[in-house]
Amino acid sequence: MIEERDLVLSNGIHCIADIHSELYARLKKESQAVTPWVYQKQYGKFVTYFVAVIIFLSLIKKLAFMYYDSSEEFLPEKKNSPTTPSVFLARIMTKLVAFNRYICYRKFPTLIFSYLGIPTSVGTFLVVMATTLYTLLYCFVPHPFYRPCAGFGSPPLSVRAGIMAISLVSFVFSLSGKINVIGWLVGLSYEKINIYHQWASILCLFFSWVHVIPFLRQARHEGGYERMHQRWKASDMWRSGVPPILFLNLLWLSSLPIARRHFYEIFLQLHWILAVGFYISLFYHVYPELNSHMYLVATIVVWFAQLFYRLAVKGYLRPGRSFMASTIANVSIVGEGCVELIVKDVDMAYSPGQHIFVRTIDKDIISNHPFSIFPSAKYPGGIKMLIRAQKGFSKRLYESNDDMKKILIDGPYGGIERDIRSFTNVYLICSGSGISTCLPFLQKYGPILHKTNLEVITLDWVVRHREDISWIRDEICTLSNNLRQLFLDGTIVVRIYVCSDSTVPGIIKTFPQTADTASDQSDLAKREKDTEFGQDDTESNSTFDKSNNEYKGLITIIPSKPDLNQVINDYQIGFRNCFICSGSDSLRYTVGNSVAGLQAKVFSNKNVEECYLHSESFGY
C-alpha cells in the first residue's frame, strides 16, 4: 500500500499521512516563502528578454548596413553626400565586421552536421549554443529543484522549466511562417532563420520533459509506483499535459532530417496538423496557471497577423486579383533530369535571388514547392524556373508529358538584404541549377553597371555536362549581344566549368562560342582560354564560325572541375566585394570558408573595405 512507502522528513512529518496536519500546513507556507511558486513565471520573461536582445542587436546591424549602403555614392544624387559616415567610424565598423565574418562565415563539415540537424554555419551555431547555454543555466543553476514534499507545491524545477518551454512556443510559431516579423526585423528570409525555428522547438521539447520528470520522480520517491498510479488516475488526462507533450514529440520525430529527406511531402502536411493539436492541447493544459496562457494568446495573434499579411501581399488574396488566380506555365525538358518552367506574363514584382512557391492544379495540388526565378529572355516580362528532377513532385513533373501546367504562385520570398549597387565587385558562384539564383543579378545589374559603384561582375558556374549550358542559352545570348563591350572590356566575366565533357552536337549550333580549342583538347594552356564546341557537319561548322566571330572572347568554357578555393583566392579583390553563391553543400562549404579567409585582406590591405557573403539554398 501507499502508506508503506511514505517519505518521512527529518522533523518526523510524513509527506502523505500527515498531509492534513497543522505542522504540514506550516511547513508548506515556509517552503513557499523560501521559493515562491508565483515567482517562477519570471523565468519565462528571462528567456523572452534574452531572445529580444538578440533580435535588437540584429536589428541594429541591419539598420547600420542600410545606412551604410544608402550613404554610398552609387547614384549621382549621393555624390559628396553629407550623410556619408566619418572615416574613423567607418574603419572601426569595417574591422569589427570583418573579424565577425572571419569567424561566422566558416562552415562545419556539411555531411555530418546536416545529418545531425546541427547548424553548419559557425555564426548560426554560436547563436544557437549561446541560447542553449543561457536557458540551461537559468533552468538548472537555481535551487532547490524539489520541495521536501509534493504537497508543499510543484517542484520549482518543473515550474520554471515549464514556463520557459511555454515562452519558447511563441518564438517557435513566430519563426515558422514564410513571412514573419522576426525575419523582417533581423533582415533574414524565412529559409535562413528556419534553423532557429528548429532549435527553439528542440529546446521547447527538452524543457517540456524537464517539466514532466520531477513530478514523476517526486511521486515515486514519496509513495512508490502506487503513488504515481494514484496521482495519474486522479488527474484529468486532457488536463494532465500528456497530449501536448505527445504532439510535441511527434512534431520532433517527423522533423528529423532523415524523415524530411525521405518523406518531405508527408512531413509538410503532417507538420501543421500536429502543430494545431499541440497548440490547442497546450492552451487547455496551462490555462490559467501563472497567466502563462498569455504567451499563447500573443503567439496566435502574431501568427495570424503574419499569415494574413502573407496571403494579402504574397499569396492568393492579393488585392485586385481573383481568389487563388491561376496562371499557365510552359513545361519543357531542357536536358537530362532538368525541367524548364516559363510563365510568360507575371503580375508580380521580384528581385534577384528570390524564389516562389509553385502549386500545380492537378493531383499534386496539396504540394507546394520553392523554385528560384529569373527573367526569361525568350518572353520579356516572363519568369523562368529550372527544376532538377529528384523525387516526389519534381520527378513527376519531369516524367509527365504535359506541355503546359496550370499553377498557383505564392511569393516572391527570400533575396538579398544588401544593396548590390553599393559594392564595387560582385562574384557570382554557383553549381547546377543554382544558376537560377545567380544569373538574375547579372541580368539586372549588368545593363546599369556604369550607373552604380559596380566595376566588375564575375560569374563562375560549375555544371556536370556540357549540354547543361543550354538551360540558360537564351539568357546568355541576350546578355552577350546587349553587353558585348562590357564582356570585351573584362567588366563582365563569365566562366563555365564543365566537369564531365559530353558534347551534344544538336544543342550547340546557336550557342555563342569563344575560341577554337575543340580540335586540341589535350593542350592544357588552351583549357584556360575560351573554349568552343565542335560540329561534325560542314553546315554546322559554317554557322558556328559566324557565331564564333561574333562572340569571340565573351564566354570562357573550361572543360575541368575547378578548385573553387583557388578560384576565389585568384580573384582580383576590389574595394567592396559581394560574393553570392548557390548550389551544392560542398560548394557552399568551400565558398564560406574561402570568403571567411578573405576577411584578412580587410586588415592587411587598405584598398579592401568589405567582403560580404550571401549564400542561397533550400535546406529546410
Curated annotation (Swiss-Prot):
The chain crosses the membrane at residues 46-66, 108-128, 168-188, 195-215, 238-258, 266-286, 293-313. The keyword Transmembrane applies. Residues 161-320 form the Ferric oxidoreductase domain. Its cofactor is FAD. GO terms for molecular function: ferric-chelate reductase (NADPH) activity; metal ion binding. Its EC number is 1.16.1.9. It is an enzyme of class 1 (oxidoreductase). It is found in: Cell membrane. It catalyses: 2 a Fe(II)-siderophore + NADP(+) + H(+) = 2 a Fe(III)-siderophore + NADPH. Heme 2 binds at residues 211, 285. Keywords: Cell membrane, Copper, Copper transport, Electron transport, FAD, Flavoprotein, Heme, Ion transport, Iron, Iron transport, Membrane, Metal-binding, NADP, Oxidoreductase, Transmembrane, Transmembrane helix, Transport. Residues 321-419 form the FAD-binding FR-type domain. The keyword Nucleotide-binding does not apply. It is a multi-pass membrane protein. GO terms for biological process: copper ion import; intracellular iron ion homeostasis; iron ion transport. FAD binds at residues 369-375. PROSITE patterns: FAD_FR. Induction: By transcription factor MAC1 upon copper deprivation. Cell surface metalloreductase. May be involved in copper homeostasis. This is Ferric/cupric reductase transmembrane component 7. The lineage of its organism: Eukaryota, Fungi, Dikarya, Ascomycota, Saccharomycotina.
